[in-house]
Amino acid sequence: STPYPTLFPYTTLFRSIHKKEEKPSYSNLNSKASLNEVRSILSKHLDKGSVDNFTNLVRDYNDTVGSVGLSGDFAPFSKTDYDVEKISSLWTAKHGDFIGTNCRINTYTLLKGKIKIPQVKSDSELLFQDKDAIDKGKLFDAKDQADFEILFSRVKTEATQDVKIHAKHMEDYYKQFTFDDKARMLSVVVHDNLDGDSLFVGHVGVLVPTTDGYLFVEKLTFEEPYQAIKFASKKDCYKYLTTKYKDYTGPGLAKPFIMDNGKWVDMD
């Protein structure tokens, strides 16, 4: 007898499970269950202390502004829209001139034990808001702050709109670092020419594997919330980032591009 008849139901079953998972789902971690779930996924790949620090930042944010329609349990992910004005006024009422944390601060908090950071000179000119937040929120000690500034240093580049050339500069810079294979840093790199041509990590988050795909964790901006998004594949996550940040450019500038750890992700 042929093995095919027995195989058939499995493949259809697999397909239907797979189909269900294709659509991304997201949470703002505004519930115990979602935060615990994400925490346990992150803990498989990251230092406990890092995950604890991150969890505390999430709790502080959601306890302060969670009432502004932030989601708890994972729900189908489409374009999200947040009431930044309302969030800002709630945040400021509680925290005064500490503006909170952003994508870079949270990514460093999670990955700091997992990336070997070279002791090289950094250009932290564009990190002025981050530095103000780190200072007012007493977020990092001097060593962490120095490493943070090296990881997200501005990188010199040329006056061109050719992404390949910029990506090469970024890859060369990140060759000095050792990244983690499992807990990956996904960055959206932006070309800037206000003060000479340079590259800058305009947005960043952490991608980890799950049993049936990937989990991407990000804090959108200082004001905007945390998002944990479940994707079926890395490529889906790259696409999300490429689409969301495609307008972070200007006349004569290259379009933003994605780095996965130290490597350029060529989307073309």
PLM region spans:
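Short, small-residue-biased leader/transition segments that mark boundaries at the very start
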Residues: 1-13
